[in-house]
């Protein structure tokens, strides 16, 4: 067998797909072991919607008055679904419907209703599970009551551009009260 140990927990889409096609592998936290396969088998794949693409509709549904938005068949893989946890921490009215764990990837329909959001702290192990959603989450925090702190997101400074600085600049351009920090930002809500 071949074993790989990573320094941090990462997305597990490849491991799930290989198992779905019959590969023998074992995942434990940051380690994956795979045994040689003589044959993999085809299987029907239902490709779910990307949670990163759904974040805009989630945000609109939470912020716009008298909204109810249903987003069908969204991937809710725990290595990617930090958005759901942050929405829960912010007091969002977000419900998972029709959860399905029978495919290679877990899916659900997301039902979102207008909510009075509250500030929260977003840090640590959840950051890699929502790194692509952070710009929209930061915008949502502008509408939340209280001060939202985002930290441990220094990775955003070294992607295609310094996304922390760009987020802060754009949030300020729309009138938000936001401070840039070394590895994230502080957003004082109630001032979109």
Language-model region placement:
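Short, structured segments at the rim of ligand-binding sites
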Residues: 1-192
């Amino acid at each position: 067998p071949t074993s790989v140990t990573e320094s941090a927990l990462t997305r597990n889409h490849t491991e799930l797909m290989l198992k779905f096609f019959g590969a023998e592998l074992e995942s434990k936290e940051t380690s994956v072991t795979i045994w040689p396969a003589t044959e993999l088998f085809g299987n029907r794949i239902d490709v779910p919607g990307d949670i990163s693409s759904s974040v805009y509709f989630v945000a609109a549904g939470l912020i716009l008055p008298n909204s109810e938005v249903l987003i069908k068949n969204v991937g809710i893989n725990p290595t990617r679904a930090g958005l759901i946890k942050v929405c829960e921490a912010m007091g969002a009215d977000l419900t998972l419907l029709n959860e399905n764990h029978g495919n290679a990837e877990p899916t659900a329909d997301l039902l979102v209703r207008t909510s009075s959001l509250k500030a929260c702290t977003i840090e640590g192990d959840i950051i890699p599970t929502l790194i692509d959603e952070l710009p929209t989450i930061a915008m949502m925090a502008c509408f939340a009551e209280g001060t939202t702190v985002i930290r441990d997101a220094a990775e955003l400074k070294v992607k295609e551009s310094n996304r922390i600085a760009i987020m802060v600049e754009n949030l300020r351009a729309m009138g938000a009260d936001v401070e840039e920090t070394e590895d994230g930002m502080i957003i004082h809500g109630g001032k979109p």
